């Protein structure tokens, strides 16, 4: 092991700020912003610039901004609530404001998830923001580095030196202390979505969490697309904290898991992100392929997020996630709808709808023929899809003929169990412009290919095309993203008989 760098924290922080600002001028360091009140005033200025036409040259009064400030705090009590609110309607978060002096009611955009490296999005860095204690029990705090998107604190970076006790865990404990003390609560820092922790040599990231729910097992290290580990904070910053990557990470690759008893903000592993982006690239070229990810590494979540995000991409008319019939029965509708809080889940809605399963053939066929701009996501089985297609062939052949010319993307979880090569060929005849992406932990290669069945594909490559991303069991064990093996040697012949 080489000699560890003893760079003091202050210099480490300054080096990181300089690096972020040097990346094509994407981030701007705001040395003039020193306190929370400075951040609120900066946000007010950004809101006024963004909404200049709506304000009609009548800038916000103090009382108007006080109401906006109160609404932001009311909607961001937890990181989950903040994430849900920031996503807003079609990626834009807004507030409705009744203007003073009888100027009427207007809607102001506060934050955008879709204006990445463009539009009115701004990217600013603040350093050592002071949080003064509000009572005798509290302690005054200063936060290392905070990244503002659209004026709101979104990413908090906590740095320790390479010689710090417990390494990167020391930075984690600092974040944990902030949360336990309520340091972020009732402040503009309630909008934080992501924590980055580093001791310079080791860097981890994780989704923001409320008091009592932060767990170090959800700290993830970064890997490149070819699975090279990225540990150093400077290399991590180049790859993950650049624009638009940082904005994409918090807007597209964070998941809202919502159940009656639990509301959790989650962030994807790097291998999940790389797989999704590889699918995007292939789909844009109408090329199929498959993802080889280790069993137990979260393929179903990856495939679902792929399906959801593809539905929002231009050039794609419909996305359908296919599962094995037993998997859909076992996982049930709620397993998917808990990750789709931004969607309606009723089969009778026409826009922004998640449809899971549905035993009603007519309902599924109606979903298939929705307009491509409707952002409908379908999760179903090959058997139910076949019945829906048969229904359209019999009842609405004209509608089915229209679908033949559409770019339909199929995401297939456990791609050899969910659909056979023959079934897939049959569906391709109905949807000739479709592209297919399979997920598997156990690809079929030439050496273990299926027995001959006429002209049908016998390997994963033959059925789906090139492998688009790999994350093997070796990688997964290194990261701790799957459980290790317990090996026990059992003898079939008693030792005395050998």
Task: Please name every model-derived segment.
Residues 399-437:
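SF2 helicase catalytic motif II
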């Amino acid at each position: 092991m080489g000699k560890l760098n003893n760079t003091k924290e202050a210099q480490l922080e300054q080096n990181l700020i300089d690096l972020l600002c040097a990346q094509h001028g994407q981030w701007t360091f705001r040395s003039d912003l020193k306190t929370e009140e400075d951040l609120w005033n900066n946000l007010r200025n950004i809101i006024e610039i963004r909404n200049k036409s709506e304000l009609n040259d009548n800038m916000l009064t103090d009382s108007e901004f006080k109401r906006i400030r109160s609404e932001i705090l009311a909607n961001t009590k937890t990181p989950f609530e903040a994430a849900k609110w920031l996503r807003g309607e079609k990626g834009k978060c807004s507030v409705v404001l009744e203007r003073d002096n009888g100027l009427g009611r207007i809607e102001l955009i506060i934050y955008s998830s879709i204006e990445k490296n463009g539009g009115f999005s701004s990217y600013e860095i603040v350093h050592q923001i002071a949080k003064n204690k509000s009572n005798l029990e509290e302690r005054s705090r200063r936060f290392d580095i905070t990244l503002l998107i659209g004026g709101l604190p979104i990413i908090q970076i906590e740095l320790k030196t390479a010689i710090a006790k417990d390494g990167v865990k020391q930075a984690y404990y600092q974040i944990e202390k902030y949360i336990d003390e309520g340091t972020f609560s009732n402040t503009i820092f309630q909008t934080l979505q992501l924590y980055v922790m580093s001791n310079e040599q080791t860097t981890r990231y994780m989704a923001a969490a409320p008091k009592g729910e932060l767990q170090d097992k959800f700290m993830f290290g970064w890997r490149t697309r070819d699975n090279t580990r990225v540990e150093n904070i400077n290399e991590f910053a180049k790859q993950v904290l650049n624009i638009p990557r940082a904005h994409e990470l918090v807007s597209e690759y964070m998941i809202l898991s919502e159940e009656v008893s639990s509301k959790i903000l989650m962030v994807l592993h790097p291998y999940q992100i790389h797989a999704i982006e590889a699918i995007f690239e292939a789909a844009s070229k109408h090329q199929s392929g498959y993802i080889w990810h280790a069993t137990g590494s979260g393929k179903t979540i990856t495939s679902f997020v792929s399906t959801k995000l593809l539905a929002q991409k231009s050039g794609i008319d419909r996305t359908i996630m296919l599962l094995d019939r037993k998997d859909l029965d076992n996982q049930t509708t709620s397993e998917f709808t808990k990750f789709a809080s931004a969607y309606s889940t009723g089969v009778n809605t026409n826009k922004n709808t998640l449809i899971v399963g549905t035993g009603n053939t007519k309902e599924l066929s109606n979903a298939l023929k929705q307009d491509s701009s409707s952002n409908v996501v379908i999760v179903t089985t090959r058997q139910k899809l076949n019945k829906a297609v048969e229904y359209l062939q019999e009842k609405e052949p004209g509608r089915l003929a229209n679908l033949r010319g559409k770019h339909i993307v199929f995401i297939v979880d456990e791609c050899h169990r969910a659909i056979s090569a023959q079934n897939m060929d049959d569906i391709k005849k109905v949807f000739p412009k479709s592209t297919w992406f399979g997920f598997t932990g156990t690809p079929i290669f030439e050496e273990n290919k299926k027995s001959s069945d006429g002209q049908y594909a016998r390997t994963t490559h033959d059925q789906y095309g090139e492998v688009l991303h790999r994350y093997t069991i070796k990688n997964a064990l290194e990261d701790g993203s799957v459980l290790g093996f317990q090996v026990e040697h059992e003898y079939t012949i008693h030792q005395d008989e050998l």
